Amino acid sequence: MLGLRFSVRSLLAILVVWLGIILLASPAQAAGDPYVSQYLRVTEPVAIDLDGNQTRLFAPDDFVVGKRLFENNCKNCHLGGTTLPNPSVSLSLAALQGAVPQRDNINNLVDYLRQPMTYDGTEENYVCRQVPGSWLPQKQVEKLAAFILRAAQKAPGWGTSDF
């Protein structure tokens, strides 16, 4: 009986130590995501242009969520910010700024994601899939847009063939 009690106490002690390590050693998500902290240079909230006149602060965790959404839904066609189906139109900042309307702010990029249009804005783009609100709520699609814009601003090689 003494051996069994010692085993249970030992297991409980190990469990408590393990949980303590997990809880105390788990920093904010962004600090745990080297891409967000190192390449996007996000370690504290960052102002991203909403519509040309206003900005909104996005927290490091927002960029982690945006990155995850990009990886799960966009990366197959937009690896490293390129556009594999149409290599001449990437997700580089210059390309986003050159689109009609410009896609270099949250609102316009979200509008594009909701209803993709060709680069010149004249007709629907059927190559890029729509992101309806029933699939991705507004806050989530804004985090995705913030990730794309921050990557276009800061990530080395984003939107080029040099990634």
Residue positions per predicted region:
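An amphipathic alpha-helix signature
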Residues: 102-114, 138-149
